Swiss-Prot record:
Keywords for the protein's UniProt record, in alphabetical order: Amphibian defense peptide, G-protein coupled receptor impairing toxin, Secreted, Toxin, Vasoactive, Vasodilator
GO BP: defense response; vasodilation
Compartments where located: Secreted
Any one Gene Ontology cellular component term annotated for this protein: extracellular region
Tissue note: Expressed by the skin glands.
Entry protein name: Des-Arg9-[Val1,Thr6]-bradykinin
């Protein structure tokens, strides 16, 4: 996942 994105 991209930085700052929490889900999975």
């Amino acid at each position: 996942v991209p930085p700052g994105f929490t889900p999975f």
